Structure formats: structure tokens, C-alpha cells
């Protein structure tokens, strides 16, 4: 009873102190407002719209809007510029996209083009220099020599087309390091051409070789060597990576979306480029709004306890025992956060199904209206609407259902009104069904399906403990990082399978069925 009387006394005092504190706050605020009107000092007013500045927090604090942070008005006396989190994200993305001019990539392309031009013009120079320098001393070229001209011409044409198809393709990415195999091939071609030029200068130019057929055969041998180098390039750059040797597991660090891929012998940086190509059309679009837990779970407060010692005698022992009892009681209380999360998820799924049903019905009615208009136009020809006008005409009937569904599924940042109209116009133009129109919105599509401004990152960072020019090995882990998330790639070598053969004699499957007079068949 003493404890209850003390508790009620504390409650009365606390309530009285709250009421007196409110009156004192009103009086102080009125005085400060009158002083601020005369001085013109800085002032900050934060007020939720639709509610008075002073409300009973003890009774209405839990009934406020969950989105109060989005509707709060902030007025400052010194602010001339404002910035939001979206602005900061946009600025960071602009800084990420503003990649400086990559001189190394253009230098590599220029070196490759120069070397290709040198190797292509060298056989022609071998054929043209002797007639230009010592035409009178050359022996006449016979039929076999003239036939070699045709061989050189077609081989050079094949070499030109093959080099264009293999080397002069639009680059998919800018690699952080040199492509080792391609650099080795370029060095090999350079050494081959320089060796032929040295031999040509010493044995043909200095000696003034009179046999023009020997000069032509020397040029043909150079073209043949270049063709073999091109064949080697095809094997090293294209065929070597086709045989699967490793299994890659790619996991997105934020939501855990994962995929498995099989690749051949590639360097780490080339595997990174290949993974990014697969990522944009295999992984669903990254939606950070789906990562947050429900607000009811996040806002749950853990109850705390304060232990006060009211007596003077044996205060230490009493307080220690009481605190232990309270802590033990708190430990025995079960945390019901998982139950709240379960019911929140069930409620969200029910809401999504409801919004989806309304959206499907609205789209079906809109497309039915389009078909009815088309049938009426065939019977009574009049002014025909183009697909854009038809899309704008029926969009109003489905706009509200579409907006609510996108908000419920948190897809509204990825679908603007203009993009929905363009997709609707596309479906009307190609006479597509309502299900074909809704396919883009009912499920999250691949990343490349959405507008580039929403997902495209021009710069990724490759993080690896191994040099990126090394080939893949079993157990290698590397990361592909961008501003919002990263892709974690782990490598496993394809196991070696040993198969054994077991011969089964066909006669072992045969059997004899003996029938007796009592046997019924």
C-alpha cells in the first residue's frame, strides 16, 4: 500500500509539473515572440501541417502521420539555398558520371591501328620498291610470278577483313590494365614485321636482287605469316574462353540477389566486364526502397527500467536486489518483433494483391474501350486517332490504379508518366493484349529495361587482392563496386569427372517363362 501511495503521488506530481511546464512554455514563447519582433533575430519554426504547434504529446504522439518527415515545413531566417538528400545523390551521380578523357584507351587504339596499317602496307612495299629503284636490272616476271600477285591480293583482302572483324570492334569497357594477350600479339606482329624489313633491307635492297620472282615469294611468305598470327589471335582471344572452366557466383551486396555463370579462361578484368554485361539483363533492377523493414518494427521501442532507492537503511542491498529482479523480468519477456514483421508482410501482400486486381481490371476495361472504338471506326469511318492520342485517351481511366499499385510495390521511381504513355502507345501500335502491357509492371524486370538515368553507372570499381591481369583461379573473390551497392564474385573451378564403364550383357536380361496346366495367363 505504501508503494502504491508513493507511486500515485509521483504520478500526480509529474502530471502537475507537465501542466505547469506547458503554461510556462506558452508564457516564454509569447515573450520571445514579442522580443523577436523588435530585434529581427534568426528563427526556426518546425510545424507539421494540419496540426497545432502545441498538442498533447501524451495522447496524440502515436497517432501522427508516419510520413511527417516528408510534410514538415522548415522556415529559417538565414537560409537562402536549400538542398535535400536527393540533390546530394544527384550531385554524387553527376560526379561519378563525369569521367575524364581516357587517354590510355585512345593511345592503345592508335597504336593498334598504326601497327595494323604498317603490317598491311609492308607486303605492298616489298613488291613496289624493286621496280621503282632498279627496274632495268630486274629479270622479267613469268607466269608463275604473275600468279603470285593474285594470291597476295586475296590473302591481303582476307587479312584485312579478318583483322577488322577481330580487332576493330567497338570497345565494351575501359579496362584498368593492359589486355595482356592482345599486347603480346601486337608485340609478335611488330617483331615479325621488323624482322622481315631487316632481312629485306640487307638481302634485297643492299644486294639489288635481280630475281623479281624471289621478291614476290618473299612478300607472299610475309602475308602467310600474318595470316597465321591472325589465326593464333582467334584461338587465344575467342576460342580459348569458350570451354567452361570456372563457375562464378555473383551476389548483390544489398538485397542478396544472386546468379551463377560458367566461364572459360579469362583474366579478372575481362571477367568483370563479362559479369557487368550479364548483370544488366539477368538481375532485377535494384530498388533500395524494398530493403527497409516495416515502420512498425523499426519504431518499436525497447522498454527500459529505472530503479530508485527511496530508503536510507540497507539502500545498497535493496537497490541491488530490486535491479536484479527487474532485469530478470525484462529478460524473460519475449520479443514479438518477428510477429509484427510477419503480420506486416501479410498485410502488405494482401494490399499488393488488391491493388494488382484493381489495376488488371482497369487496364482490361481500357483496352476493351480501344477495341470498341476500332470496331466503330470500321463501321462508320471518321477521323482516326493515332496511337499517341489513343494512349492519352485511355490513360486517364487507369492512371489512379496504376499510381496506387506502383506506390504499394515501391516502383514509382522507375516508371514516370511519360514512360508509361510511351509503353502504352507501343502496345496499341503493335496490337498487344492487356497482359502484355502489364508484364512490365507486375514483376520487376531486368535492369536494362528501365531508363538509363535510373540505373546506368558509367564507372565501376574493381576491387581484387590478385592482379587484375591474372587469370581466374579456384577460390578467387573480387568485388565490383558502385555508389549504391557492390557485386561480390566468388570463383569455383569446375570439378574433374571420372567416368567408368560397366558392360551389361544383353543375354542377362532374358528369362524363360514356364507354364503349367494350372497357370492362368
Curated annotation (Swiss-Prot):
Membrane topology term reads: Multi-pass membrane protein
The segments annotated as topological domain Cytoplasmic are 1-108, 169-178, 239-521
Q: Where in the cell is it found?
A: Cell membrane
* Chain intervals for the UniProt region annotation (Disordered): 1-81
Residue ranges annotated as transmembrane are 109-129, 148-168, 179-199, 218-238
Record's Pfam families?
A: Strabismus
What is the organism lineage in this UniProt record?
Eukaryota, Metazoa, Chordata, Craniata, Vertebrata
Q: Where is the composition biased (Low complexity)?
A: 69-81
Residue intervals annotated with topology Extracellular: 130-147, 200-217
- Main localisation: membrane
Name of the protein? Vang-like protein 2
Family indicated by similarity: Belongs to the Vang family.
Amino acid composition bias (Basic residues), ranges on this chain: 15-33
Q: What does this protein do?
A: Involved in the control of early morphogenesis and patterning of both axial midline structures and the development of neural plate. Plays a role in the regulation of planar cell polarity, particularly in the orientation of stereociliary bundles in the cochlea. Required for polarization and movement of myocardializing cells in the outflow tract and seems to act via RHOA signaling to regulate this process. Required for cell surface localization of FZD3 and FZD6 in the inner ear.
- Transcription as a keyword? no
Against InterPro entries, the record matches this protein to: VANGL
Linked disorder reads: Neural tube defects: Congenital malformations of the central nervous system and adjacent structures related to defective neural tube closure during the first trimester of pregnancy. Failure of neural tube closure can occur at any level of the embryonic axis. Common NTD forms include anencephaly, myelomeningocele and spina bifida, which result from the failure of fusion in the cranial and spinal region of the neural tube. NTDs have a multifactorial etiology encompassing both genetic and environmental components.
Its source organism is: Homo sapiens (Human)
Give the GO biological process terms. Answer: anterior/posterior pattern specification; apical protein localization; cell migration involved in kidney development; cochlea morphogenesis; convergent extension involved in axis elongation; convergent extension involved in neural plate elongation; digestive tract morphogenesis; dopaminergic neuron axon guidance
Q: Which UniProt keywords apply?
A: Cell membrane, Developmental protein, Disease variant, Membrane, Transmembrane, Transmembrane helix
What GO cellular component term, any one, is given? plasma membrane
Q: What is the effect of changing residue 437 to S?
A: In NTD; the mutation protein completely abrogates interaction with DVL1 compared to wild-type
Cell membrane is among the record's keywords? yes
Amino acid at each position: 500500500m505504501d508503494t502504491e501511495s508513493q507511486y500515485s503521488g509521483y504520478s500526480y506530481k509529474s502530471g502537475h509539473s507537465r501542466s505547469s511546464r506547458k503554461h510556462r512554455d506558452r508564457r516564454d514563447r509569447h515573450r520571445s515572440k514579442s522580443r523577436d519582433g523588435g530585434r529581427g533575430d534568426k528563427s526556426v519554426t518546425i510545424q507539421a501541417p494540419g496540426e497545432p504547434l502545441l498538442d498533447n504529446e501524451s495522447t496524440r504522439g502515436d497517432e501522427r502521420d508516419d510520413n511527417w518527415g516528408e510534410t514538415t515545413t522548415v522556415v529559417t531566417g538565414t537560409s537562402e539555398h536549400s538542398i535535400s538528400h536527393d540533390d546530394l545523390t544527384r550531385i554524387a551521380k553527376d560526379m561519378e558520371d563525369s569521367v575524364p578523357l581516357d587517354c590510355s584507351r585512345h593511345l592503345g587504339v592508335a597504336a593498334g591501328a598504326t601497327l595494323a596499317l604498317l603490317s598491311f602496307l609492308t607486303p605492298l612495299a616489298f613488291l613496289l620498291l624493286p621496280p621503282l629503284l632498279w627496274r632495268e636490272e630486274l629479270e622479267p616476271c613469268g607466269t608463275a610470278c604473275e600468279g603470285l600477285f593474285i594470291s597476295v591480293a586475296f590473302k591481303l583482302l582476307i587479312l584485312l577483313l579478318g583483322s577488322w572483324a577481330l580487332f576493330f570492334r567497338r570497345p565494351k569497357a575501359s579496362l584498368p590494365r593492359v589486355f595482356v594477350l592482345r599486347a603480346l600479339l601486337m608485340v609478335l606482329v611488330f617483331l615479325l614485321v621488323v624482322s622481315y624489313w631487316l632481312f629485306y633491307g640487307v638481302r634485297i635492297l643492299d644486294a639489288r636482287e635481280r630475281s623479281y620472282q624471289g621478291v614476290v615469294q618473299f612478300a607472299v611468305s610475309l602475308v602467310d605469316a600474318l595470316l597465321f598470327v591472325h589465326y593464333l589471335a582467334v584461338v587465344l582471344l575467342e576460342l580459348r574462353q569458350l570451354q567452361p572452366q570456372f563457375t562464378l557466383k555473383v551476389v548483390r551486396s544489398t538485397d542478396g540477389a544472386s546468379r551463377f555463370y560458367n566461364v572459360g579462361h579469362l583474366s579478372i578484368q575481362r571477367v568483370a566486364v563479362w559479369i557487368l554485361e550479364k548483370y544488366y539483363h539477368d538481375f532485377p533492377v535494384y530498388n533500395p526502397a524494398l530493403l527497409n523493414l516495416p515502420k512498425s518494427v523499426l519504431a518499436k521501442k525497447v522498454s527500459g527500467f529505472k530503479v530508485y532507492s527511496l530508503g536510507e537503511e540497507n539502500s545498497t542491498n535493496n537497490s541491488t536486489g530490486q535491479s536484479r529482479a527487474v532485469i530478470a523480468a525484462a529478460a524473460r519477456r519475449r520479443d514479438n518483433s518477428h510477429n509484427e514483421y510477419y503480420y506486416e508482410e501479410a498485410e502488405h501482400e494482401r494490399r499488393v494483391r488488391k491493388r494488382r486486381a484493381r489495376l488488371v481490371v482497369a487496364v482490361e476495361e481500357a483496352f476493351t474501350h480501344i477495341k470498341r472504338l476500332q470496331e466503330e471506326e470500321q463501321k462508320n469511318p471518321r477521323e482516326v486517332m493515332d496511337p499517341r492520342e489513343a494512349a492519352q485517351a485511355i490513360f486517364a481511366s487507369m492512371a489512379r490504379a496504376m499510381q496506387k499499385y506502383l506506390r504499394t510495390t515501391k516502383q514509382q521511381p522507375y516508371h514516370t508518366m511519360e514512360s508509361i504513355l510511351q509503353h502504352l502507345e507501343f502496345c496499341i501500335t503493335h496490337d498487344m493484349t492487356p497482359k502484355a502491357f502489364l508484364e512490365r509492371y507486375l514483376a520487376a524486370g531486368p535492369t536494362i529495361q528501365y531508363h538509363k538515368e535510373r540505373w546506368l553507372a558509367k564507372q565501376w570499381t574493381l576491387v581484387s587482392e590478385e592482379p587484375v591481369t591474372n587469370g581466374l583461379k579456384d577460390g578467387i573473390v573480387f568485388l565490383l563496386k558502385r555508389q549504391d551497392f557492390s557485386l561480390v564474385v566468388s570463383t569455383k573451378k569446375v570439378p574433374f569427372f571420372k567416368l567408368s564403364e560397366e558392360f551389361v550383357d544383353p543375354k542377362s536380361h532374358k528369362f524363360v517363362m514356364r507354364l503349367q496346366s494350372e497357370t492362368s495367363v
